[in-house]
Swiss-Prot record:
Domain of life: Eukaryota
Classification via PANTHER family: 5-FORMYLTETRAHYDROFOLATE CYCLO-LIGASE-RELATED, METHENYLTETRAHYDROFOLATE SYNTHASE DOMAIN-CONTAINING PROTEIN
Keyword Secreted appears in the UniProt entry: no
Organism the protein comes from: Danio rerio (Zebrafish)
Name under which the protein is recorded: Methenyltetrahydrofolate synthase domain-containing protein
Every RRM domain range: 306-382
Gene Ontology CC: one annotated term: cytoplasm
Length: 382
């Protein structure tokens, strides 16, 4: 089947992600949640694809299955529970461990199992699995934004699937005999250039769509463990289990040296910090926006800001949806001045760098059939 999404020479992984997200949105190929940007798309036909996974011999023969918690893999989780397999899901953002095991209550009905397979069920019916439990995983099922028939995979950009697999390899939970499957829409299968693939990226053995079962025969190795030299110490603070794994590997005599910030990069970072020091009121406005308040009461910003002007906003888009989108894209402004009736809005940022980054990201978004127009306006004193 000829790929419907083409990757041009010189395009980055983020270019590919935006192409896929925009294509799925404009073609209306996804179910809730929408928009699909910054998500593993819950594509139409996901249940049919999951049913194909359940029919695979490697699924039937697996005793322990690790499945991502994203919505399109819900059918695989349900199939695993119905087949009485040991079902593992990643701990959210790896904050408190690596795995949770879904444990349905005794005498669970089909409806209870269905609930257990959902995001709500994962919260209510799961227990953490510790590093000492020595889990052996037979099959890994991951979501993807884009994949190739060669087994190359591009996720949503946070790196958790890659990190989870590397951590499992570090723990001895996966081996060369562990299969990796991804469940996607046909449009997500494309020719991914090899130069976009890095050594920490997770490869897939099977691609399952609603219409196809593709065995990739991937030649690239999967991660064999954590590449400590690619991690900063800040990442260990965010993911505590990494500290434990690093200690274990260090005790085993392995090289666990972390990535060092280059002197030039450090000087550049310091110079940027000197150019703009965070204002207490800016931090307060940021928190107010994050808690769904349009603006903080009692004051207007009294420091230099740069405005991003949005036009051609979809008529049905609500300000709450825009806020959610800005959070997902990690371009939260100090303040939003909403003029939905006129299909425009003004986003206030603390400095030109933040505004410029937001403009570049927002210009690529395709929401509800519309491309939002974003333009950076010169700094002003508010």
């Amino acid at each position: 089947m000829e790929p419907v999404i083409k990757i041009n020479q010189g395009e980055t992984k983020w270019d590919v992600r935006h192409k896929v997200w925009n294509y799925i949105e404009v073609k209306n190929l996804a179910n809730f949640p929408r928009p699909v940007h910054n998500r593993i798309p819950n594509f139409k036909g996901a249940l049919e694809a999951c049913n194909k996974v359940a029919q695979l011999e490697i699924f039937i023969e697996s005793a322990v299955v690790k499945v991502d918690p994203d919505k399109p893999m819900e059918g695989v989780r349900l199939a695993a529970l119905k087949a009485r397999k040991s079902l593992l899901v990643p701990t959210p953002r790896l904050r408190f461990g690596l795995f949770n095991r879904i444990t349905p209550p005794k005498g669970a009905t089909k409806e209870t199992l269905r609930v257990c397979s959902t995001s709500q069920g994962i919260k209510e019916f799961s227990v953490p699995v510790g590093l000492d439990d020595k889990v052996q995983v037979d099959l890994v099922v991951v979501g993807s934004v884009a994949v190739s028939e060669k087994g190359y995979r591009i996720g949503k950009g946070e790196g958790f699937a890659d990190m989870e697999y590397a951590m499992m390899a570090c723990m001895g939970s996966v081996t060369e005999s562990t299969w990796v499957i991804t469940v996607v829409h046909d449009c997500q299968v494309m020719d991914i250039p090899e130069e976009l693939i890095e050594r920490h990226d997770l490869m897939v053995d099977f691609i399952i769509t609603a219409t196809r079962v593709i065995k990739t025969e991937c030649k690239h190795p999967k991660p064999q463990g954590i590449i400590w030299s690619m991690l900063h110490k800040e990442e260990l603070k965010k993911i505590p289990i990494l500290k434990k794994l690093r200690t274990l590997e260090q005790e085993a005599g392995k090289d666990v040296a972390l990535k060092l910030i280059h002197a030039g990069e450090d000087e550049y970072r310091k110079s940027k910090e000197l150019q703009w020091q965070s204002h207490p009121k800016a931090d307060l406005e940021f928190k107010c926006l994050a808690s769904n308040s349009d603006r903080c009461s009692g004051f207007e910003p009294k420091f230099p800001t740069t405005t991003v002007y949005l036009s051609d906003i979809p008529p049905a888009l609500r300000v709450s949806e825009l806020k959610g989108l800005l959070r997902e894209q990690e371009v939260v402004p100090l303040q939003i001045r909403w003029q939905g009736a006129k299909r425009k809005a003004f986003l206030l940022y603390a400095d030109f760098t933040g505004a410029e980054r937001a403009t570049a990201i927002l210009q690529k978004l395709f929401i509800n059939g519309h491309t939002i127009q974003a333009k950076c306006v010169s700094s002003q004193k508010m």
